Amino acid sequence: MSVKHFLNTQDWSRPELDALLDQARAFKQSKLGDQLKGKAVALVFFNPSMRTRTSFELGTFQLGGHAVVLQPGKDAWPIEFDLGTVMDGDTEEHIAEVAKVLARYADILAVRAFPKFVDWQVDRQDRVLQAFAKYSPVPVINMETITHPCQELAHILALQEHFGTTDLRGKKYVLTWTYHPKIGRAHV
């Protein structure tokens, strides 16, 4: 059986996404549950986060699980992503090992890794997230790389609640966000 990762919404069917939204609605009603009882979630942050980290840590706890936060290069060894690289520089671990080792400890891996915003041809490969998915035998959740599928679902749920319907066809809205200096300077 293949592992079902949540890397982007395009990999999931409409009925699967609708089922996730239905489950999110149910979670909002009850606040606490045991769906993750006895489960561990490894949250791997290559970039800072406030809302996403808080949401995932508290969400894991509220569903009965335990989250561990790792920040490669800060409180965990830096990770190498290129195959065949001699590991004599800044990186101490290779993704092929890291993903498998973390999967022995955790039931789910969640990854946040922004692209470099230098070369779109490189960034669009989403190498960090794709490497975790390639080597992990447990599900990988994208906490934001070049896409933010969990935030996409949160937006859809908010719009459905605002409009009072799950059918958003023909509904008009404005989506805006705060300027991010790193992304704002990108040539993508």
What are the residue ranges of the model-derived segments?
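Positively charged, low-complexity intrinsically disordered leader regions
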Residues: M1-T54, L58
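Short, solvent-exposed coil/turn linker segments
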Residues: N8-D11, Q71, D167
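Glycine- and other small-residue-rich loops at beta-strand/loop junctions that grip anionic moieties
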Residues: T9, F45-F46, Q121, M143-E144, ...
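Generic structural signal for well-ordered alpha-helical scaffold segments
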Residues: R25-Q29, I156-G164
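Phosphate/diphosphate ligand-binding glycine-rich loop within oxidoreductases
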Residues: L36-A42, M50-Q160
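Glycine-rich phosphate/diphosphate-binding loop of Rossmann-like nucleotide-binding domains
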Residues: F46-H66, Q160-H187
